[in-house]
Amino acid sequence: MEVLMAERANLVFHNKAINGTAMKRLISRLIDHFGMAYTSHILDQVKTLGFQQATATSISLGIDDLLTIPSKGWLVQDAEQQSLILEKHHHYGNVHAVEKLRQSIEIWYATSEYLRQEMNPNFRMTDPFNPVHIMSFSGARGNASQVHQLVGMRGLMSDPQGQMIDLPIQSNLREGLSLTEYIISCYGARKGVVDTAVRTSDAGYLTRRLVEVVQHIVVRRTDCGTARGISVSPRNGMMPERIFIQTLIGRVLADDIYMGPRCIATRNQDIGIGLVNRFITFRAQPISIRTPFTCRSTSWICRLCYGRSPTHGDLVELGEAVGIIAGQSIGEPGTQLTLRTFHTGGVFTGGTAEHVRAPSNGKIKFNEDLVHPTRTRHGHPAFLCSIDLYVTIESEDILHNVNIPPKSLLLVQNDQYVESEQVIAEIRAGISTLNFKEKVRKHIYSDSDGEMHWSTDVYHAPEFTYGNVHLLPKTSHLWILLGRPCRSSLVYLSIHKDQDQMNAHFLSGKRRYTSNLSVTNDQARQKLFSSDFSGKKEDRIPDYSDLNRIICAGQYNLVYSPILHENSDLLSKRRRNKFIIPLHSIQELENELMPCSGISIEIPVNGIFRRNSILAYFDDPRYRRKSSGIIKYGTVETHSVIKKEDLLEYRGVKEFRPKYQMKVDRFFFIPEEVHILPGSSSIMVRNNSIVGVDTQITLNLRSRVGGLVRVERKKKRIELKIFSGDIHFPGETDKISRHTGVLIPPGTGKRNSKESKKVKNWIYVQRITPSKKKFFVLVRPVVTYEITDGINLATLFPPDPLQERDNVQLRIVNYILYGNGKPIRGISDTSIQLVRTCLVLNWNQDKKSSSCEEARASFVEIRTNGLIRHFLRINLVKSPISYIGKRNDPSGSGLLSDNGSDCTNINPFSSIYSYSKAKIQQSINQPQGTIHTLLNRNKECQSLIILSAANCSRMGPFKDVKYHSVIKKSIKKDPLIPIRNSLGPLGTSLPIENFYSSYHLITHNQILVTNYLQLDNLKQTFQVIKFKYYLMDENGKIFNPDPCRNIILNPFNLNWYFLHHNYCEETSKIISLGQFICENVCIAKNGPPLKSGQVILVQVDSIVIRSAKPYLATPGATVHGHYGETLYEGDTLVTFIYEKSRSGDITQGLPKVEQVLEVRSVDSISMNLEKRIEGWNKCITRILGIPWGFLIGAELTIAQSRISLVNKIQQVYRSQGVQIHNRHLEIIVRQITSKVLVSEDGMSNVFSPGELIGLLRAERMGRALEEAICYRVVLLGITRASLNTQSFISEASFQETARVLAKAALRGRIDWLKGLKENVVLGGVIPVGTGFKGLVHPSKQHNNIPLETKKKNLFEGEMRDILFHHKKLFDSCLSKNFHDIPEQSFIGFNDS
């Protein structure tokens, strides 16, 4: 008794509240001290005590017990304020979407975390006996997260994909949620429910597959005798100490470990906690341990390679079914973890970085050479320090020194005044946080339609031009210049050229348009949109659909017609200096039966044109005939223009014939059917007989028309013609009959005939004499063609205000291809072209260049945005001016009509040359938009963008400016002109006298720009020319002077700013044309704040900005699309790749584990592979070039891939706070990686190619046969591995039963019943269990000579193991030289 009393007196009395962790420690020490049975009694007493106390307390829970944290209100308000500022920055283009999302998540996460930390102290101070507090913080019911949702705020939720919903729930469950919050909360809660249902089954299936792979692995031997192991080093800092201890405890050493000369641990010794601590204190060299990877037995495992059993802490017993234990211990946490998510209901968890705060107020100083500027994750500017940085803070009387660790971000500038507790630096959340990060792609989509522009920081380098992936070298902006692209199936190519003014509602109407020429210019002019100076637009926007696509340009009405179909081939076909541009005329769009015709541009072979040469011709389909016939010019006077031998091609038949090209107003075509037959053929009809339609003429020929037959026999062939028409037998008095071959105009009656009918159409009278006495008259129908004379294209080009002489003239002439009365023969079914529309080239006879008799022409290929365009360049030889006309303009042709006539003449050349210069008449009365054509994604058709009045805003004082009165007067005089013409944002101004203006002009020619800039400075008055702007890229080249870009600019897209008059000198320095301006940048001292956009016009007192939206992109982001491409709303602009923390539940983890175990690829390949290769093992160079290096390389690859698989799976589980011993994973990974694929048929024919065999089996077979077997290692997924086991019964019970059994039967496979499953299926005794010693053979002792090495590292250790393992193989296959010194060479290699 006394002894007991004395012992009691010695016991230490702890007066402490015991919590969960303390309880765990107590239990483990009790077990160590007393053993299992005794401990369980002690714990029973503790349990009883607990129940008694709880009954006495009798806790009840009411809603009043949920106390809200008082500081919540201002915390939430603060967070909202920060979010607002952030939104503004994003709008101005200072941060991009990823940074914004990341920062807003961190703001709310930090708020939520802060509330959670306040919770415990709050309860402790206000109400320590609060039942909620007692229950949750003792761990009896509920955890901190749930209580936080009840009394703090619910915070951020995840959606079912595990992504963040960036709208936080600010209320807690005690206050109640608003409707929006409730819906978001349901979203998160649903995720919890779904996960519980779905993921539980997933986890179960995972467990089943895992067990299937490893069910046959049992401990069968004590020692397999391997000399290999895996090196684990505490030194390399990659592995935290905790994980290092976990890895080592319970393993067996593969090698002796020395501390200097002393051996502190021997081979095959198992490692306990004491030994591990000694390793850590001594910082010993890498420790080589045995793992299941290195075990040499094929289908089981030995005790030493497995290590200690987790149940009782001694070496594992023989007959233990370690495989099944491994499978279950990996699968089981999955089910547990899914259940855990259910209760928290999808609340997001993330991580925040640690901050360094200033200790007191003062000025901060640091060495600026040690830091370099960078951006933080949230887009704030900061300094990155690469080494330890000492920061001093000087307050009035003391200096504070703060040490900032490397890789941290410094958030303040040098010499800045900081206040106490201000955040001055952010420590990078390093490897210490076990958050599982992953790379995510985030696409940024465009908010509006428009045209894409990059800042000059994106490379326009040639190698990037053709790909659609543009990597950003540094942080820069992408701009979307606003404008409305018109989507349509027909590409609207027409006479609209770049910078034409046109209707903004132009293309929104119907698809097919008819020309309606009744609208006169005055009507059209009144209907145009007008707005007064203050920027208000009229209430009524007129409907333009009745204008029917008419543009009033000077004296022509240009009718807009959709010409080209988008499928037609835009690139021309090229035949020997001849280009054909495909073209559809209007009629073809309606019936689409006629074959395609095109404009052909012909250049003489030597490339030299004389005067009046034909440059191009167009075969008009209206003048095309299928049948043969005769052309008559009638009474019209003809004059021959050019007579030249020309080569005509009709379906490959080439004939030289003189081509009479006559210029006539009207001609007649008399159709006839002609058959040319060989002389020997028999004809079934008589000469001068009359036949009907479809009469048989010869054996295989029938007539197409009815009429009179004429047969003429030539030398070797017979010509048979059939004339259609009426036959008259006139009386003798009939005068008309004496003439043959006469054209009679309509309106003349026939004399002396019984019916005095008037002739309605032209007819052709022909006298036919079948015999000497009889004759009759054949009246044949005539097709009449009117040719209107072509328009001289010179009228399309107004005189150039720049007084540059434009020498080249082009005019259009229609020529008839056949002479008067010439018979025209069609060859088989080809159609015959009667009239050809030609473009005749001429030039002025200048006094200076009068000697210029010839012009050189050539095709120029220009490549823009991947589409090749051809330009035709005509050079007057002695004249310095070169003229570039637009040739393969996909716009085909437009319709031009004479002013008064109602007959439209197809003029295919109008569009080809209508944009030769970047200038258009001043008098164009402008509707409201400017066109821009852009290339589409598919690079075939163009799309237009209309910039119209919807994007225009003007600001600024009008009262100060005096000379506007001139404008107002002129407007009163001529009320038809809309006000916006007077000072339109599109740069056109009325030619008002002394209108004081200084436009900066942007034209195609840089030279002109400089001249005008000088004029500006001289403040001269001049007439404003319509502007065309350009942009410069980073090389200073002018980007995109291509006249074929069309966006319809809409005045609402243009912002018009008025500045004070005296501001001109300063402005010109700050604002340059084409410059992009972010929102809220003030250009004047008291000027208006600007909207973001691009400056397209600078004037004395105002600038015009085309509104644009900036998007920020950081380095490494991928830009989609091309410079200047049209984008629609919702198109992808940029893709960011960023890292984010996974949300805190296994939902994301389990699929990850499964992905690794099924060996699916996880990571996307990074764009810069060079960086990956740099990080490879430095020792790799030592392997290369050694005779057996390839073998070592292969071994190392297998070992390395196994280790990295294990690490990947461990990462997922550790991030969930689940501890699984590595050896379980190793057993499974060993099974996945232990099969090889036989790749070549060796001489021995042991294995067939493509067969999967065990790795060890292949090695043994190679040694036995003394010849190499070629194989490659494959990573099988767990499903495939369980279908490729030794036993077909276990395979069949897993999946595809019928197939597996049928195959096994055909192959005659034998099942040795080594595993558990087979025996369970067949009802036998399972060959496992620690009592089952029957199958175990005493292990053979291998007398191996370990190689003595003192200095080792990971690489040498593995190298030695591999060499040792393959020693016999080397001895057999290495050459004689190696035979003499094998032992020394190994040792030398290791000592190096």
Swiss-Prot record:
Highest taxon of the lineage: Eukaryota
Annotated EC: 2.7.7.6
GO terms of biological process kind: DNA-templated transcription
A Pfam family matched in the record: RNA_pol_Rpb1_5
Cofactor: Zn(2+)
Family: Belongs to the RNA polymerase beta' chain family. RpoC2 subfamily.
Record lineage: Eukaryota, Viridiplantae, Streptophyta, Embryophyta, Tracheophyta
Quaternary state and interactors: In plastids the minimal PEP RNA polymerase catalytic core is composed of four subunits: alpha, beta, beta', and beta''. When a (nuclear-encoded) sigma factor is associated with the core the holoenzyme is formed, which can initiate transcription.
GO cellular component: chloroplast; DNA-directed RNA polymerase complex; mitochondrion
This protein's name: DNA-directed RNA polymerase subunit beta''
Annotated organism of origin: Nicotiana tabacum
UniProt keyword annotations, A-Z: Chloroplast, DNA-directed RNA polymerase, Metal-binding, Nucleotidyltransferase, Plastid, Transcription, Transferase, Zinc
Reaction(s) the record says it catalyses: RNA(n) + a ribonucleoside 5'-triphosphate = RNA(n+1) + diphosphate
Gene: rpoC2
